[in-house]
């Protein structure tokens, strides 16, 4: 391909938002951790899923086929979460999710979602996340 000789209009997207098709017969709630069902469709995260991000709004695909609805997910940022066993000494610790609203410092079969950036109080911390980095982890 030759180098540009003129302006090109390119469709850019917001860097921290992605839209993903939703699995059939399910609802993903605002704030949920969203995972991949291994077929390319978003669902409420289950342990071991690929981490798509956090749901920006509720998406109801209960009566739809797979892909009829899309969900907007935040793919990077920082979020305050309840984390089982979190103490002030856990700054920098890896955080995992076992479902769409359960967070822990224990890896086992859970999904890595980010790292503790700030301790808020016992069992609550701010987690930084970036789905492109977690995908490579």
Regions found by a protein language model. Give the residues of each.
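Surface-exposed, low-hydrophobicity beta-strand/loop segments enriched in small/polar/acidic residues
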Residues: 1-137
């Amino acid at each position: 391909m030759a180098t540009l000789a003129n302006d090109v209009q390119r469709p850019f997207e917001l860097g921290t938002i992605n839209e993903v098709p939703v699995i059939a017969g399910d609802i993903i709630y605002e704030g949920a951790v969203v995972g991949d069902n291994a077929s390319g469709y978003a669902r409420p995260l289950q342990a071991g899923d690929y981490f798509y991000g956090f749901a920006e709004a509720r998406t109801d695909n209960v009566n739809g086929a797979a892909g009829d609805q899309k969900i907007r997910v935040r793919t990077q940022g920082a979020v305050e979460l309840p984390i089982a066993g979190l103490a002030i000494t856990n700054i920098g610790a890896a955080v995992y999710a076992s479902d769409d609203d359960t967070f822990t410092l224990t890896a086992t079969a859970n999904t890595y979602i980010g790292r503790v950036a700030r301790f808020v109080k016992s069992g609550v911390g701010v987690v930084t996340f970036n789905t492109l980095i977690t995908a490579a982890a």
